[in-house]
């Protein structure tokens, strides 16, 4: 817009974060052209930091306010734990997204296609889409959620799962070391 008399204007929000994340994503794909879009997206999500303030700029944001957090392309680009070396990535491809639409009963694909994917063991439940975030709607009782990670770390790297469960929920990760 036009800001008469002003030489500078600070702009923030989703309209600015989208082009910034797109640029960071392009740099990440340049560093790892062999990574799928899902792997690159998971690298951005799992290396984001969660020290994000809410809209009031005083209280800390919760996951519903900030999503995965604040993407952090800076710092040591090649350091372990950076977006270029996240350690683990989550893969999801065409079959996983087609199975997701089957599970939503949108009628986009034929029942035969959906049966084929089910026969391959590809889950159709939205909460089992192999992405870096987990969301379970209408949770009553217990629910098993499955994620598969792919190591992009140096050979011999070891990992330990750590979960900060929402208040009132118990979360167990099996195995928790790999």
Model regions and ranges:
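Hydrolase catalytic cores
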Residues: 1-61
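Secreted peptidase-domain scaffold signal
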Residues: 62-178
């Amino acid at each position: 817009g036009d800001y008469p008399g002003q030489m500078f204007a600070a702009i923030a929000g989703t309209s600015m974060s989208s082009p910034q994340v797109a640029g960071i994503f392009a740099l990440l794909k340049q560093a790892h052209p062999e990574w799928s879009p899902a792997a690159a997206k998971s690298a951005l999500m799992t290396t984001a930091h969660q020290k994000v303030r809410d809209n009031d700029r005083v209280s800390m944001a919760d996951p519903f306010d900030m999503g995965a957090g604040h993407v952090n392309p800076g710092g040591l680009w090649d350091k372990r734990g950076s977006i270029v070396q996240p350690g683990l990535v989550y893969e999801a491809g065409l079959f996983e997204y087609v199975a997701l639409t089957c599970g939503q009963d949108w009628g986009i694909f034929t029942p035969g296609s959906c049966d084929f994917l089910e026969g391959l063991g590809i889950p159709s439940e939205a909460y089992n889409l192999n992405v870096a975030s987990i969301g379970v709607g209408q949770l009553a009782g217990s629910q098993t959620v499955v994620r598969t990670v792919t190591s992009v770390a140096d050979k011999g790297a070891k990992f330990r799962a750590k979960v900060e469960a929402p208040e009132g929920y118990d979360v167990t990760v099996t195995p928790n070391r790999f």
